[in-house]
């Protein structure tokens, strides 16, 4: 234990001396660190040289530790904590929006009020009492050190997705915010806003205009939008305010020229993809966390925009070893850390180095203590088996042959299908009372046969799209039509104006009775041999010209779409002792947003073990990532999509994409669909870490599945091979 803190002291002092040229003056001015704060998935700890770790707070995940002249601020999943002395703590959440989660305890409803998930927290170096934070769809400003917060709106977008915020004095106070899709915006906040913490008042007044600041930022390929900015840093040094930005998914670092509103590129790496986040300033250097290492960028000479100015700290290995030692002493995943120099009196006399997003330093999917089912679900490779093909031995044998010859180890099969029908005979009478059995398989025989061939069995359960439950008890569970006062049915109108109903009927995602029905089905399927339960259509309806007429009668006050999904998953997690996976839209895995569906990967990853994005190339805009050579589009989508989703999820859940093993009559597929189309998707997943995938063909035709020797040995030459289709 006595060797632990000196390691940290050596790391920072040596690194600063080596990169800034300040040499012994650093040691004379600051001495060594007197303590280290560690934020984990479950709390905040203090480590000192002579004592065991001290638990300071144990209320939840610590995302960021911010030390200002005001005191110590801690960004958590319960909101914002504040202390002046690390001994006495208080919440500073007044005015921040609240989400309501529903729990069912011994058959009775209970409600938990939590601050909405906060994305970032920063203060104005010129006025530390001025602070800024953000939810997914609102920016909040404080002028009194976080004692109260006001909503100043969000960048002009109908889509949620705020990632980072900052506040600076730029001839008056200015708030900066990055949106995952639409880039960076700025808002002058010289006057105190009239809006309150109520989300309904989130619109800026006419005097408050969000100004786009995307000039100079690298665009997301084949789009008109800049790629996501992970963090914005306001760095005040020698009386000068400078603003820096770091992109999330590519090695790009910028400085903003406020006068010209232009981002100048400071550094560009060579990797197609590299996750990075947690940008801070320390002794005339920028520090940030990349995959596998802590990185420094010296500000002493920025005439070059290549890797010459990027210096991976020579003590990176020691830092990572120290973090691992901290995790041995504190057996919880480390999320953030703050190194504290000794100070006399207030924190303002200390020189802190605060690091966040430390999950990036760890190998993916190793938090088995926190989520034990991840180990079971990892590295599963398989296909979706249409349940009708499992009814007879002859048709099932075709898929056993595919399983064996293609060297796959997983089968996904419907047990509650898209029409709400049960494809097995339930033993629990509560299931039979709500569901309808239709052409069931012999469950015990099926499980026995497939396990004899080494199959990991996944039961697909369609959740909130359920025509059978929709019509039960006079529509008791249905999403309701507020105009017609009857169960809601989405429809569209064709060119002639004729109404055409969508082939979907939805039950209310807020209904705890629907949750219990799904949980009971899941429990029985696991008990009867399924290894994993996979939920599809775990979302709200998204289609229909009459979508605005939907009413959710089971909704309790304060709940929204996200809190309904989270409440459902919390309920399931407490009732099902097996790996849980969910299917999501490809766009919700690509961007940090739950737009349209309520599927926020960043939040959902805490509650499930596997997330399965449907990155089907046919379902994206046909020009999306179709830059030259266009044949590589399927590879790009799956390679980058898998890595992006892993980053958004912070590696808290396995990303196991569905691979498109079917042809769709759209422009790109008409020209390029062939065996290589499927193989390129697979190679994208494999090159993104190879943690698992599922082939999807809803009629069960898998002629295009690559042979094992092809998928294991195909290299760059395959990726660039012509499709031979004109």
What do the predicted segments below correspond to?
Residues 371-391, 464-524:
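Active-site-adjacent "subsite" loops/lids of carbohydrate-active enzymes
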Residues 334, 341-343, 347-348, 356, ...:
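Substrate-binding cleft of secreted/luminal carbohydrate-active enzymes
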Residues 397-420, 527-532, 610, 688-691:
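Catalytic domains of carbohydrate-active enzymes, especially glycoside hydrolases
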Residues 553-666, 712:
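Glycoside hydrolase catalytic-domain groove-lining segments
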Residues 19-33, 54-69, 93-126, 153-170, ...:
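Short coil-to-beta transitions that initiate beta-strands within beta-rich domains
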Residues 41-45, 77-81, 87, 137-140, ...:
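Loop/turn residues immediately N-terminal
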Residues 47, 83, 142-143, 186-190, ...:
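Conserved Ser/Thr-centered positions that define the repeating blades of beta-propeller domains
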Residues 406-440:
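Aromatic-lined carbohydrate-binding/catalytic grooves of carbohydrate-active enzymes
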